[in-house]
UniProtKB/Swiss-Prot annotation:
Tissues showing expression: Expressed in the bone marrow, spleen and thymus in lymphoid organs, and the lung, kidney and heart in non-lymphoid organs.
Gene behind this protein: Bst1
Organism (species): Mus musculus (Mouse)
Enzymatic reactions: NAD(+) + H2O = ADP-D-ribose + nicotinamide + H(+); NAD(+) = cyclic ADP-beta-D-ribose + nicotinamide + H(+); cyclic ADP-beta-D-ribose + H2O = ADP-D-ribose
Descriptive protein name: ADP-ribosyl cyclase/cyclic ADP-ribose hydrolase 2
GO MF assignments: NAD+ nucleosidase activity, cyclic ADP-ribose generating; transferase activity
Compartments, record wording: Cell membrane
SUPFAM superfamilies on file: N-(deoxy)ribosyltransferase-like
Residue numbers binding NAD(+): W102, W165, E203
Length: 311
């Protein structure tokens, strides 16, 4: 009995020890941990961007030093204002009519913008590029970065990554001018325009009305749907009414054709894309008919000239 009791106690001790280890290994926060090699990625992106866009007046090392100050702060005590120096050192002009705001279609926006060749989204300006798709935060009760998890808005409002994007969004809006393009996802189940989100809370309020000509909304639907919302419907109507109340000239287009063409590149035979292909075929056939007609006319003229010369 004593042996059995000892084995039971040992088993219980091992079980409790394992449980303690497992609980200790659980992530503290809901978000991804700090991206490995954060500094190297940051500096590499900065160097590439400033070289390609000829921003020779930017000091990437100084920009990193300004950014990394937040890495010494409690992970739930980082404010947008903590990025002020970083923003001031990294900001640069955005070409007029080239700003592209968005919600729920990050990758499509990146593809269409094509590294600032067509349009310039927030992730295409220097202060957005260096942090895009990255995560960072300090450990909660210790120095050093937390590579296991970082807080999201569900954990605390003033987390390092959300505060970064809030600060960047506000500056991006202030620097935008002319025609403002907005790409929304009309297939998003929760609605194309989140009434609480970065665009609604940290971009629209900071647009400079005297610098904005008009706002053009593109409601894009996934190839194959679903078509949850379109212009004048649901949350899109809420956005249109808000812009109207703020005094902005605005328009709305469902499935803006240049973007839709890009979406159809990988779905050329899908029914949603067939009309585009058919239109192109019709244009090709029309061009061929014109060419045939021109050739026939030329032959007729040559025959007529030959006949008149023989006469």
């Amino acid at each position: 009995m004593a042996v059995q009791g000892g084995l039971l106690s040992l088993w219980l001790w091992l079980w409790l020890s394992l449980l303690t280890v497992l609980l200790g290994a659980r992530a503290r926060w809901r978000g991804e941990g700090t991206t490995p090699h954060l500094q190297s990625i940051f500096l590499g992106r900065c160097a590439e961007y400033t070289t390609l866009l000829s921003l020779g007046n930017k000091n990437c090392t100084a920009i990193w030093e300004a950014f990394k100050g937040v890495l010494d702060k409690d992970p739930c005590s980082v404010l947008p204002s903590d990025y002020d120096l970083f923003i001031n050192l990294s900001r640069h002009p955005i070409p007029r009519d080239k700003s592209l705001f968005w919600e729920n279609n990050h990758l499509l926006v990146m593809s269409y913008g094509e590294n600032t060749r067509r349009l310039v989204a927030l992730c295409d300006v220097l202060y957005g590029k260096v942090g895009d798709f990255l995560s960072w935060c300090r450990q909660e009760n210790a120095s050093g970065l937390d590579y296991q998890s970082c807080p999201t808005s569900e954990d605390c409002e003033n987390n390092a990554v959300d505060s970064y994007w809030k600060s960047a969004s506000m500056q991006y809006s202030r620097d935008s001018s002319g025609v403002i393009n907005v790409m929304l996802n009309g297939s998003e189940p929760k609605g194309a325009y989140p009434t609480r989100g970065f665009f609604a809370d940290f971009e629209i309020p900071y647009l400079q009305k005297d610098k904005v000509t008009r706002i053009e909304i593109w409601v894009m639907h996934d190839v194959g749907g679903p078509n949850v919302e379109s212009c004048g419907e649901g949350s899109v109507k809420i956005l249109e009414d808000r812009l109207e109340a703020l005094g902005f000239q605005h328009s709305c287009i469902n499935d803006y054709r240049p973007v839709k063409f890009l979406m159809c590149v990988d779905h050329s035979t899908h029914p949603d894309c067939i009309m585009n292909s058919a239109s192109a075929s019709m244009r090709r056939e029309s061009a061929s008919l014109h060419a045939i007609g021109d050739a026939s006319l030329l032959i007729s003229l040559l025959v007529a000239l030959a006949s008149s010369s023989q006469a």
